[in-house]
């Protein structure tokens, strides 16, 4: 609603991204295909958009599914039921976030070293990238 009367070319990148996601949801398809739906958003809005998508597909009465292309490893770890890890156009690994997001897969796919931190009480994991950026 907050963007309804504003011209699209007057919106910021993040606002445009949220409008595009809202338009896709308004179409009410059975299958959503999102290509980087959080790319221009700050962290709070990334989580808000992904929670909205998660709510759409987790409702047992809706029978909706979503395929989300995303480069943020931690957002994928938090929201994905299944992950396809692609490297140079080929599927390198497929499965749950815990199965796919291993230090070896991330090192090969993203060419960075990392540490996987898994919560002991549940299946939550976090990827801590260790590589430093040289200035």
Each model region followed by its residue ranges:
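Catalytic Walker B motif of ABC-type/P-loop ATPase nucleotide-binding domains
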Residues: 32-35
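ABC ATPase "signature
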Residues: 94-95
């Amino acid at each position: 609603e907050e963007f309804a009367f504003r011209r699209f070319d007057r919106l910021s990148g993040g606002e445009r991204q949220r409008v595009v996601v809202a338009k896709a949801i308004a179409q009410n398809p059975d299958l959503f295909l999102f290509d980087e739906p959080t790319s221009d958003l700050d962290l709070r809005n990334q989580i808000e958009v992904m929670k909205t998508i998660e709510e759409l597909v987790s409702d047992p009465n809706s029978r909706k599914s979503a395929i989300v292309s995303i480069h943020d490893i931690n957002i994928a770890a938090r929201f994905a039921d299944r992950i396809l890890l692609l490297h140079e156009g080929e599927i390198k690994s497929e499965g749950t976030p815990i199965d796919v997001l291993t230090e070896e897969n991330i090192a090969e796919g993203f060419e960075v070293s990392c540490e996987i931190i898994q919560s002991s009480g549940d299946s939550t994991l976090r990827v801590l990238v260790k590589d430093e950026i040289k200035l």
